[in-house]
């Protein structure tokens, strides 16, 4: 009985250790230029910026949303968690917007590093990147429900 108890306890400890070292889901954040007057925005206002329904920030600066390539983990997170849709639906939206309104999608850059550099250089820029990539050159924008 003691041996069976010890074996069961050892199995639980190994299972707990295995889960502790397992892969963690990467975290992503929205970033803006350090001069941006907002510390947070709600999802609908962020959506208006990225879907080009609003072209300027309230203080007058041109809004410059920046996208990462299709199927990037950060873009998948942004589409699902912030816009509450899929990447494919966003692409369909832009096909329709180009055809009906002549509106182009956000600038697409090849990497999170490029997005961060662009946000740091442009007062009206907004992008999403892995949280681990944030440094003092940009400001994290909190997403309100």
Q: For the regions a protein language model found, what residue spans apply to each?
A:
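Exported/periplasmic ABC-transporter solute-binding proteins
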Residues: 21-145
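Hydrophobic h-region of N-terminal signal peptides that target proteins for export
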Residues: 11-20
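Bacterial N-terminal signal peptides that target proteins for export
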Residues: 1-8
């Amino acid at each position: 009985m003691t041996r069976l108890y010890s074996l069961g306890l050892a199995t639980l400890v190994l299972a707990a250790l295995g889960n502790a070292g397992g892969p963690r889901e990467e975290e992503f954040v929205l970033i803006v230029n350090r001069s941006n007057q907002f510390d947070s925005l709600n999802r609908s206002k962020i959506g208006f910026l990225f879907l080009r329904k609003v072209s300027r920030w309230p203080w007058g600066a041109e809004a410059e949303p920046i996208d990462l390539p299709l199927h990037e983990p950060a873009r998948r997170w942004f589409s699902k968690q912030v816009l509450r849709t899929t990447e494919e639906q966003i692409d369909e939206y832009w096909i329709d917007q180009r055809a009906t309104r002549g509106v182009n999608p956000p600038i697409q850059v090849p990497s999170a590093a490029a997005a961060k550099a662009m946000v740091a250089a442009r007062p009206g820029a907004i992008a999403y990147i892995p949280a681990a990539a944030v440094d003092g050159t940009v400001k994290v924008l909190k997403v309100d429900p």
